[in-house]
Amino acid sequence: MAVPHFSVSVVARGSGRSAVLSAAYRHCARMDYEREARTIDYRAKQGLLHEEFVIPAESPEWLRSMIADRSVASASEAFWNKVEDFEKRSDAQLAKDVTIALPIELTTEQNIVLVRDFVERHVTAKGMVADWVYHDAPGNPHVHLMTTLRPLTADGFGAKKLAVVGPDGNSLRNDAGKIVYELWAGSLDDFNAFRDGWFACQNRHLALAGLDIRIDGRSFEKQGIELTPTIHLGVGTKAIERKATTDDQAVSLERLELQEEKRAENARRIQRRPEIVLDLITREKSVFDERDVAKILHRYIDDPGVFHSLMARILQSPKTLRLERERIAFATGIRAPAKYTTRELIRLEAEMGSRAIWLSRRSSHGVRKEVLEAAFSRHSRLSDEQKTAIEHVAGAERIAAVIGRAGAGKTTMMKAAREAWEAAGYRVVGGALAGKAAEGLEKEAGIASRTLSSWELRWNEGRKQLDDKTIFVLDEAGMVSSRQMALFVETATKAGAKLVLVGDPEQLQPIEAGAAFRAIADRIGYAELETIYRQREQWMCDASLDLARGNVGKVVDTYRANGRMMRSELKAEAVQNLIADWDRDYDPTKTTLILAHLRRDVRMLNQMARAKLVERGIVDAGFSFKAEDGNRRFAPGDQIVFLKNEGALGVKNGMRGKVVEAAQNRIVAEIGEVEHRRQVMVESRFYNNLDHGYATTIHKSQGATVDRVKVLASLSLDRHLTYVAMTRHREDLGVYYGARSFAKSGGLIQILSQKNSKETTLDYEKATFYRQALRFAEARGMHLVNVARTIARDRLEWTVRQKQKLADLTQRLVAIGARFGLAVGAKTTNSQNLKETRPMVAGIATFPKSMEQAVADRLEVDPGLKKQWEDVSTRFHLVYTQPEVAFKAVNVDAMLKDETVAKSALSNMANQPESYGSLKGKTGLLASRADKQDRERAERNVPALAQSLSDYMRQRSRAEQCYQADELAVRRKVAIEIPALSPGARQTLERVRDAIDRNDLPAALEFALADRQVKAELEGFARAVTERFGERAFLPLAAKDTNGETFKTITAGMNPGPKAEVQSAWNTMRTVQQLNAHERTIEALKQAETLRQTKSQGLSLK
């Protein structure tokens, strides 16, 4: 039994749920949600195995006619839409939702019969409609059951509450004389009876299936099981206890020994599972290099060989993904280490983003307009921008973000928002990474707050849990790691709470920190606060507020009316017009920016804009500068952008500046504004992450403010990107677009108004890992071209390696198989005449480790090879001054792969050992006696080194062949299929099993021998079972059922699917082996009797 799970919840509008949406999801179907005039489509969801829509026997005619001639899903759609239409309240309870785990011991057909029995006894018998589906998740088969909360009447539905009838037939009244009512759908006592009824029904069906299993659904306490937390006294605690009876020196030595014990144990654990190191590193940083791995290993590993072996295993682990290759920087000649991350982190961040999008599309935590107006009236000094931000965070969506610099009024805004939430009946709590920030949030905004770690601790202890009436405000969100942010997003999602993220605009920049906050803000959008409105014109300020509220259509009309929406027929014409207008309006005393969403557009616009300035003589052709992405030319007056953080210069990724001096591979740039303005000198050999800054992506402009902005609109824009692009200016804004492409896609306003368009295909279950990796790198400001090339090249090289490995392995396996008499013969079948039958237990054809990996693992622990390698290592140390350098030069790996290379290397080593490195000691007149002795010793050991290495390679080759043969035999064995039995054979085996249970083995054998065809089929079945599992695998007492040790041993390492197949076929395989054993016993007795009679006859002749 996976889990004796039985949970009941209510589908209620108050919690943002819908009966139609729930039904569509469970039926994996497309349904029309009539109340909201929209369609829900879950047809892509998988796992639906069976579905039924069952009505009570005495159902009214309207219900019968409604579902007549409809499919199950269609009947469900029609019924729950009627329920939704009947319930008028905004917080109406619509249905009871029951989730039940099914016993994995039963077959699919048996589980369906079980659920039908339960529904008939405990649901429809009480006049309830039962809409249920069977989901077959691997290892977790379960049922979702939706039932009604109102009785059915002739024209619709009755009341949810009914008067309790007393013994006299009249309505029961309480002491105050009022009529007592009860819920028609049942109270807590009814729920307990409902739950107990399920377990009773389940146990009955388990017994009918011949399974000696009973499920007790009660709590541990009610079962009399005393589960108390145990206290683990570790070695450190014991050392402290012993300290009281020892002197100070003894305690000190004892603690040192304890430290070494811990290091040794950690070393062993890392060797068993090197991925522990990845877990340690990724708690601190999401992108790392070899040095980070080495730092962790150095804490615990002393042996150089083990150290380097673990380094290789970690960096080549399937869990590791290389984002950028190691490379020599062209401009500096400095070697940049390769950058890595883990697949788990990429998937975690992608899932976090998907959850954030899901929350943003849920409407459950809205605050009524009159409540907001009351809050605004109490805070008369709120600006329009602050009010707009409050409206944004107080919206119905279950997640929201707000951005504002320190002093921009975030605290005042959050205080007013808290009052509005509390007035609407919500509990508001907050958290921050640092205690000081949490304290400030509580003191200034009145939001009860703790550190994030404190919240996690309380949740793990079952305290202070969030619920669907909780608003959680997370301050300084840009400081929170992806892992921790993912936890809070997941917690809010599961608890039904609302999450409000508060951050700083600097944290929106694509730098190394704050990637989690950016990943969410980019997906859901945000409200923005500024101490001073950017726009100078009032109509522009009003338009920015409308953009913040999502009124994109109104804003487009406003800007069009003011001549700021520049229409062209084609995008190419729009680009030309944009550059022409930018050139005409260019004023060196004003800050300007061209914005586009696509990088290729940005690169083109930068080139065209600078070309115009050079053409007019505003800037010179300039001097060449070796930038990371190729040569650029810079001259005084050029606008530039920094693309990487550099503390020594005081610049950050996305920061803009203006060149004031330029020379070959050197510039002086002015950065900052007003009193923070300063100059920095940049030389390409020290910093080369620069580009022209006339145009930039909309993402990089987040948090920026300039005088004039030109925007190139594209079909990839959405509501959030439009908001960012159209609110960066102080004085003027122009939007340029090609009308033809927008017209084909629904129109300009529709495209600019769409929500999360760039995420409409982002589904964590289906999104490609490649795309997730690029988004992960983008959020950290990495060079996407380099990342894409690295991933693609690594994938290609891996594929080529696997192809060659497969070819080499095939040749080796054929040779080994022939040597061990395992020749492979070819079979031909007529596929048209062969009727495919699914086996009872499928053969295993895929394995968690490749053949090469499995053999390598055994070679790694081979004691003979270990001893031989120690001799090789010792000889290297005796012969060479730098043994590790010489070992690398010898390239043992290449020798192991190619016998010709090995012979050449061994010959070279014996005759010219100096070619691999300097020998130990010295010769000549100036050499000391010790040096001469070292050289003599080295020369004497050269032949021994070559011989030791040759012996090691020969011994390893033999061991490798042996292990390959063993592994091949094991894999061929588990690849054997256990065939399905015909109905006649199954019936015969059932009769055999009954006879065995009656201890009537002769009758069992008689049944088996009665039909020759069935007998032959059972013999083939038994042969397959023996070949795969062994002749007596199912005969011991421990193999009586699947609860014994035999089952655990046989299924060790299996995936849930194959394990379930073995479990299902267990009794059949055991029966056939018992039958075979009885046959062998009878045959042995016959032979013994024959031999006895022969001997007796021989004696009588004498």
UniProtKB/Swiss-Prot annotation:
Keyword field: ATP-binding, Conjugation, Nucleotide-binding, Plasmid
Gene3D superfamilies assigned to the protein according to its UniProt record, in alphabetical order: 2.30.30.940, 3.30.930.30, P-loop containing nucleotide triphosphate hydrolases
InterPro entries per record: (+)RNA_virus_helicase_core_dom (IPR027351), Bep_BID (IPR041533), Coronavir_polyprotein_1ab (IPR050534), MobA_MobL (IPR005053), P-loop_NTPase (IPR027417), TraA_Ti (IPR014136)
Single GO molecular function: DNA helicase activity
Sites where the protein binds ATP: G404, R405, A406, G407, A408, G409, K410, T411
Top-rank taxon: Bacteria
Pfam families (UniProt xref): AAA_30, Bep_C_terminal, MobA_MobL, Viral_helicase1
Family from the record: Belongs to the MobA/MobL family.
Name assigned to this protein: Probable conjugal transfer protein TraA
Gene: traA
